[in-house]
């Protein structure tokens, strides 16, 4: 895969798919600028070469055409602050204003196009729409790993209209780090899987059983495993239709010599509430009417030990309902163990979504090896699927 380091952008207009799908508050201020911040080095390389940048992205999920709350103009102030130069805006992505402003762009200038998803054609992967986008630039750059698993017009289809195309620094780093874990993991290798549902993680767990030495299961999905083993899990979250599958995964882990670590105990609550009454209980005997909302102290101890003795760590999904203070300890302690292992030379990849949010919230983003920006894209990559956005750059 070619990266932007292989290209000189002098006098060229780069059409760049970025991921500016960032959260906004009620006054339309960006509340988390990580995705914008991540792509700044890509933009700087192109501008320093003497090129210009045309940025395209989606924001949110607009239903019926343009909606002000989903306008990318709300990201301009943040982008200008981080980039240290003015950013022009086109109130469309394929209309007359976009075409004129792109054509008049001088070296060193930046133009941001309006939200791609204001057009239904974007998510449909419409070829004519992609061709119109392609007319705006000379070279195509994709720096949006978070949407690489979608064959949309701007992430995949548009690439066919360019002789020169390349991955930006974010895209290249994402693919390199995922490859490192998938193909060249130093042993012992532990995968930590959390989150609510087994159904979201079946494929990745099956793939990882061929790669890892240890598999840690936490979060809501662990109760489906305990119920499958005949335990009493009270009214903890259980996917009744996945009990056989959970048993099957336990057997597969055994057959492949993978040590499967389920949480021994839980912090249980009498209701799903930040102010609920809580106790610690063994996971095989949770009281009727109570539910497990975090891993317990014994589980923390076992998990931490496994993590701290590992050389490669992949973490995807929290250990409990970490948005609520009473149920955040498990996720926090696992994060601390990952940081400790990393400081001793382990390679740690944090897989997007909630795990990335938890690591950021704890101030640990710089203390792990890599935090992925792509939740769904990373999962699909580890499931062994081809990512259309990555394939389009080859």
Predicted features, each with a name:
Residues 1-394:
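Active-site loop-to-helix "anion-binding N-cap" substructures in soluble metabolic enzymes
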